[in-house]
Amino acid sequence: MLETTNGEASPEDPPLNLKSLSQPPQKRSRTVEDFNRFCSFVLTYAGYIPTPATEERPWTPPSSVSPHRTEESDGWDSSPQLPVPSDPPQPPATSDISTIETFVMKAKSQGGGGNSIMKTGGPIGGSGEQVKKGSRRKRRQLHRGGVTMSDTDTDEEERDKRPAGSLPAPQLPPSAESSRDGGGSSSDTDTQVMDEDIMVESGDDSWDLVTCYCEKPFAGRPMIECNICCTWVHLSCAKIRKSNVPDVYYCQKCRGGRGSGGTALKEEP
């Protein structure tokens, strides 16, 4: 009994190799190189990247030999090796091509997803979503811009359809502005009235009349009358400003004879 317990194993205990074979195989973690190879294959398949001349065959899935097999073999060296069952049949390469085709179709349906991948040149996970969001924002802005343009067009059409009576009020004439400013004095208005009274139309007979001692015709220029001799003299010859026209005026001749007949001049109002 002791020999059987020490030297021989009981038939109930399964062998160690069967325990290790019953565990599911561990999946190999994907690396950045694998992802880059997958992206390059997808882009070449979609036609965004020209196929290099050196590559004769497209990218194929990794071979059946995986690193976890070597790790398992390293751990089995201590135990006696048993016949290893064959690996489960892997799906054909057509499944990978079908997934790539669906990926390309989705990218095209989303409005140039492949172009966004080309622009980013990095992983598809985060940057691709950001590019998609940016393209959506641009589309919204363009749509909003089109709406605003249509609104402006309608506003212009409404302005064209408005009647003439709805136009803004015309500007006031300069005379009203001058009256508002209040810069003009009452004397200026008086002189303007006097000038208008003195001015004569060109068709009148007095237009060519010569009365001033300058021997020049009236010609419509403002003149003043002497209170003694009743002679009309140009204001420019009498050196009188239009803004300061006196009520009583004496010409040069009357002023010269004022010394002898000064009493008569004083009697006149």
Curated annotation (Swiss-Prot):
* Primary location recorded for the protein, binned into one broad class: nucleus
Q: Is Lyase there in the keyword field?
A: no
Q: Which UniProt keywords apply?
A: Autophagy, Cytoplasm, Metal-binding, Nucleus, Zinc, Zinc-finger
What InterPro entries does this protein map onto?
Zinc_finger_PHD-type_CS (IPR019786), Znf_FYVE_PHD (IPR011011), Znf_PHD (IPR001965), Znf_PHD-finger (IPR019787), Znf_RING/FYVE/PHD (IPR013083)
User: SMART domains from the entry?
Assistant: PHD (SM00249)
Q: Where is this region: Disordered?
A: 1-31, 52-193
Annotated zinc fingers (PHD-type), start-end = 209-257
Taken from the record, one Pfam family name reads PHD
Domain-related comment:
The PHD-type zinc-finger domain is required for negative regulation of autophagy.
Name by which UniProt lists this protein: PHD finger protein 23B
